[in-house]
Amino acid sequence: FHVLHGGIQATLIDEIASWAIFSHEKTAGVTTEMQVKYRRPVRTDQGEIWLRAKVTEVARRLVTAHVELFNEKNELATEADVVYMIYPEEVARKKLDWPGAEAFYKPVEEEE
């Protein structure tokens, strides 16, 4: 108990990879491959976890991101390389209901 299931870790990794890729390429796509390496347990009852992602390769329509998930002790617990096939923006808008990159960069309104 209190250990984050590997499938949930993979879901978090896939999600953060998509944000990195979508913001880098300004369009949407779909996951085509994900290679995950589980190195340490991730506890859910002893502190916060965090992830970071970086686009590492762009080869035409295939974009790769490397993702790292850190456990509650700030140790690298899981890492993955995630490959997405991206679509031209017009296709992404039609097939994936892509709202456009601007939807992800709306300025935060100042409090009055």
Describe these PLM feature segments:
Residues F1-W19, L96-E112:
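Hot-dog-fold acyl-thioester-processing enzymes
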Residues I13, A17-F22, G29, T64, ...:
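Amphipathic, positively biased hydrophobic alpha-helical segments used for protein targeting
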Residues V3, T31-K37, W50, T64, ...:
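Conserved beta-strand segments that form the floor/walls of ligand-binding pockets within enzyme
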Residues V42-D45, T56-E112:
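HotDog/MaoC-like acyl-thioester-processing domains
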Residues I16-W50, V55-T56:
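Hydrophobic beta-strand-centered segment that forms part of the acyl-chain substrate-binding groove
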